[in-house]
Amino acid sequence: MSRAVFLDRDGVINRAVVREGKPYPPATLAEFEILPGVLDALRELDEAGFLLIVATNQPDVARGLQSRETVEAMHRRLRNELPLDDIKVCYEVESPTSLCYKPKPGMLLEAAQERNIDLSRSYMVGDRWRDIGCGRAAGCFTIFIDRGYAEELMDVPDVTCADLVQASAHILHHASLEPAKRSV
């Protein structure tokens, strides 16, 4: 089975727009800025054999605040510039019937089924409590990127890091401590 690093998008891979202490996705492709160090961090994880999968809530599309075309253009840029294996997107708003909207683990469970991923040997990296809740619900090791937002963490992450560069180093170290698993 494969190991994966699941990554939130806004605030982890690209710069989030922060207003009054709360993060928002960039509204336009011109505002979409990949954070420093992200490319190198992802290359190291890719070279170590991890699948790299973005799992992102984009409810502004359902709310009519952003077009799906703009989100897809941002994702084309990510695919062109970063060594990503997949991008899972939940375009829904939070509701009891949504299976994909984080903190529900639907996007991670779907990726695990499609790509034969061992979630217990995988990681979820995010900058909001929803990401940590999602990773925990899926059975992943969770890493919180602390951006200092004015919101409370609902779930305790396994580790807190300053950015994806630090998170990547932690993942590579943590994974090196894991006993080798033989395929049968």
Question: What residues fall within each predicted segment?
Answer:
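Conserved short-loop catalytic and cofactor-binding motifs
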Residues: 26-29, 59-63, 95-99, 155
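Conserved protein kinase catalytic core
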Residues: 14-16, 21, 63, 133, ...
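Residue-level signal for short segments within beta-strands and strand-turn junctions
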Residues: 15-17, 91, 146
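Anionic group-transfer/hydrolysis microenvironments
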Residues: 10, 59, 104
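Asp-based, Mg2+/Mn2+-dependent phosphohydrolase catalytic module
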Residues: 3, 68-86, 95-124, 128-184
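Substrate-recognition element of Asp-dependent hydrolases with the DxDx(T/V) motif
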Residues: 38-71, 75, 84-96, 135
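Active-site neighborhood of HAD-like aspartate-dependent phosphohydrolases
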Residues: 1-51
